[in-house]
């Protein structure tokens, strides 16, 4: 079995794979102040609930966009699983040709998603990840990662609206069926929701126009379902795209990481 860990700015997603099949998955809040023991106890609690033990795990791979938490994560893997994890970063075999100014700047989550989407759905492909930031990545018909766009995520924008507009309340992010709100809260929710649907459709359309291609569009991330249910611009919703990419990258790099 393989343990895959995706460390995002808001949440960490943990999954267990066996023979390329996702058996279990969990989510925990990303807290950069957590110790390795706190992380270990959380993961072991997940395992206990699923009748798994640390000895079931033969390898671990981690993707992280939160550098301060990585020392604790790596220590946790060694202390509780006796495994030195594979870290997605420079030197890892991805199978992608990165045609960008500085490949080291690309977030590991974007690389992982691009690997998974290219393998699972073919190229050309656009990957939209609705996370803390909303990211758009374009991989052309030759499998070349051409770059993309990064926009503030839904939660960031919602909090900014509350923090910078004195008379506007904090609101929950919710799907809205009416663009014309009848109250301040309803108007904010409509603006936030339809604003991000429009952002998604507009950026996808512009990528298609500038690339002169007809890529398949794959969406992932915690808020992807809510947005994509209102948008015809997305072809495929894959909530486990990042975990799939991690498992695939582990197999591509397995000879140097398995215990």
UniProtKB/Swiss-Prot annotation:
UniProt KW keywords: ATP-binding, Coenzyme A biosynthesis, Cytoplasm, Kinase, Metal-binding, Nucleotide-binding, Potassium, Transferase
Reactions this protein catalyses: (R)-pantothenate + ATP = (R)-4'-phosphopantothenate + ADP + H(+)
Record-listed E.C. numbers: 2.7.1.33
Subcellular locations according to the entry: Cytoplasm
Residues that hold ATP according to the record: 6-13, 132
Cofactor: NH4(+); K(+)
GO biological process: one example: coenzyme A biosynthetic process
Gene Ontology cellular component list: cytoplasm
Location, primary (coarse class): cytoplasm
Pathways per UniProt: Cofactor biosynthesis; coenzyme A biosynthesis; CoA from (R)-pantothenate: step 1/5
Cofactor notes: A monovalent cation. Ammonium or potassium.
Binding positions (K(+)): 129
The keyword DNA repair belongs to this UniProt entry's keyword annotation: no
Domain of life per record: Bacteria
CDD domains named in the record: ASKHA_NBD_PanK-III
Functional summary from the UniProt entry: Catalyzes the phosphorylation of pantothenate (Pan), the first step in CoA biosynthesis.
HAMAP family membership: Pantothen_kinase_3
Subunit structure: Homodimer.
Family assignment from sequence similarity: Belongs to the type III pantothenate kinase family.
Official protein name in the record: Type III pantothenate kinase
Source species: Listeria monocytogenes serotype 4a (strain HCC23)
